[in-house]
Amino acid sequence: MRRWLRSILVLLVCTLSVGAQAEDMLMVRSRAQFEESMSALQEAISAQGYTLSRVQRVDIGLSESGFKTDKYRAVFFGKPEEIRTLSARYPELIPYIPLQIVIFAEGDETLLVAANPMHLRADYADAELGAVFARWEQDMRTIMEQVRKAE
């Protein structure tokens, strides 16, 4: 009986830890084609009050490495004044800003993937930054959900 309970406990802990790790990434799948999803992503970013910084093609390097993909982009965005302020106050945040969402075609659908900004909270005890990370997470979820709903 004791062994059985221990096994259940180990299984429960493993299940919970996998769920916690999954929250490090935000991901949605859109039924829309890549072009429509890319357009919806740019509109959703703007609607949330962010400025599109740049769109970087990732597929070129992948193709040169032998992978077959023709629609793979990293979309960078942020609020310019916020980026300047945070970069000056917290230079160690520079690698994480501007925010980014990766968008790529998979068959007839499009996937969007991003690192959850809340994972940064573990490294910063500052309550002000915690609020910023929470807002970024909510905004990214909203942006990605708008793209998911786009047809």
Where are the regions that the model predicts?
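Compact, glycine-rich, soluble single-domain proteins
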Residues: 46, 50-99
